[in-house]
Amino acid sequence: MKLCYNQATTLENSNLVKDLEYCEKNGYDYIEIRTMDKLPEYLKDHTLDELKHFFQTNHIKPLALNALVFFNNRDEAGYKEIITEFKGMMETAKALNIPYVVAVPLVTEEKILKSEIKRSCVNVLTELSEIAKPYGVKVALEFIGHPQCTVNTFGQAYEIVEAVGRDNIGLVLDCFHFHAMGSNISDLEKADISKIFILHMDDTEDFPVGFLTDEDRVWPGHGAINLDQMLSILKEKGYSGAVSVELFRPEYYQLSAEEAIKTAKDTTVEVVSKHFTLETTK
């Protein structure tokens, strides 16, 4: 299994240049590039060609653009914006040889029937599939374990991916989001493992279902999630994708970027290596 870094872990105490430097130094195989802030910030003073050259001359490679945000149940103007943004992402993915784009469902206070959520998600993801196909890019739907997210459990997300029925549409399995809204472990046991494109590794303080927020995340193995159970199921089912550590904890933003990146690796390796062989270079 290969190790990936998600830039949310140093959201407030680093930038793409530093993240790449310290991830390369600490033996990460991949990075998920944040398209809403870290990439635009980088492009103020650098070019995509410079970024491409970095990846060509170093071990670390880009795994995903993270993320196409709030893609479903939008009005006509919002829908057009999403499609335009996604087409731009395809050009970035092509330039940097990035295999995945993460797609995040709408978060809203509005009550929307699950049937309407599914219909919209299936329609948009099917269109994204068509757009992505010539680029060889896959789209990974990331359900968010929060009551206000329109797709907030593994089972709901898996049903949507199944309904789309395209090889280039799958899931992000985030351990925090799985735990946070009480996703059913039996749904994971029954899932087609080829539909899980990316594994997000994290842990959390022990708050009740429905009360957890991203800020409650802690280093893998330092919280309340039964990570061993999830990892053993993934191992048994033959998961072969990357594991990407993703934390949003404010107190970790007080650390130096290098310390956070090293600790994220060490804690992830400690948890994951009980079940998978990690191929990190350092």
UniProtKB/Swiss-Prot annotation:
It comes from the Bacteria. Keywords: Isomerase, Metal-binding. Its cofactor is a divalent metal cation. Its EC number is 5.3.99.11. A divalent metal cation binds at residues 142, 174, 200, 246. Signal peptide: none annotated. InterPro entries: IolE/XylAMocC-like, Xyl_isomerase-like_sf, Xyl_isomerase-like_TIM-brl. It catalyses: scyllo-inosose = scyllo-inosine. Pathway: Polyol metabolism; myo-inositol degradation into acetyl-CoA. Binds 1 divalent metal cation per subunit. It is an enzyme of class 5 (isomerase). One of its GO terms (molecular function) is isomerase activity. Involved in the reversible interconverion of 2-keto-myo-inositol (2KMI, inosose or 2,4,6/3,5-pentahydroxycyclohexanone) to 1-keto-D-chiro-inositol (1KDCI or 2,3,5/4,6-pentahydroxycyclohexanone). Belongs to the IolI family. This is Inosose isomerase. It comes from Halalkalibacterium halodurans (strain ATCC BAA-125 / DSM 18197 / FERM 7344 / JCM 9153 / C-125).
